[in-house]
Amino acid sequence: MRLFRSPLAALAVVAGALLLYGCSDSSTPTGPGDDDPSGDGSAPQFNSRAAPGDSARAFLSDRQFTELRLEVDYMEGYEPTQAGLDSLKAALERHLAKSSITIGAPTSIPAQGDSTYSAEEIRTLEDEYRDHVTQGGSDTIWAYFLVLDGKFTDGSVVGLAYYNTSMAFFGETIREITGGVSQPSRTKVEATVFRHEFGHNLGLVDNGIPMQRDHQDEAHGAHCTNDQCVMYYAIETTDFFGNVFDGTIPGFGEYGTEDMAAQR
């Protein structure tokens, strides 16, 4: 759900499902649709601090960018599983019109040692550690994953999309809900949450691209009514993985697939 369009970053929590919306810190915000933001005939600029879903078409089609690269940073001790990242790549390759999708080798960054992280702290960490952003005139759109060594201030949240190309995941929360007796594997939880949060930045469920058929759970914003779809609202929370998840990594569903195909 697109709740905020102010020049201030804002946080919305709807029934435990969280989306964080950011804005440009530039005095002249620009976006992927700006033909000539500088007015001097130079290549279009790209705003990597827009709201989740704002760059959905740039991800889905090859009209502006033919390649996707994902930068992955993780705090020491919380490296994401390769199988979880491979599962995400396979899903993106099925749905995105890109000649190449590359997930870079995860890079370790210093653990901060904080038990929780606020929205502002997450943005600050990205400013410090993110190496690659999308450049105007390039064939490559860059996305960013940040895996933290603590929890979000709302401890039930597993991951979030907080800018149009940026997603964060809470390593300590994932650790607590995986690997134990009767708990799912870390790989399957990561694979599921990676898809879900990337789905927000693909504009799914009326969060940047139109629905071909109505499947929005309006009570929970940009989430699907189908509880077998990876965009089901509860997937962002620990309760889902503790009580509902059967180990099957959900796909984007028939309706979500239709929505993405219409943009290719």
Task: Name every feature range the model reports, one short phrase each.
Residues Q64, G137, Y163, C224-T225:
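A short, structural micro-pattern
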Residues V181-G256:
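The catalytic-center signature of Zn2+-dependent metalloproteases
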Residues M1-L11:
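Bacterial N-terminal signal peptides that target proteins for export
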Residues V133-I209:
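Active-site-proximal segment of zinc-dependent metalloprotease catalytic domains
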Residues R2, H132-G136, H220-H223:
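A general structural signal for short secondary-structure junctions and capping/turn motifs
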Residues A168, E172, P250-R264:
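Short, cationic low-complexity segments
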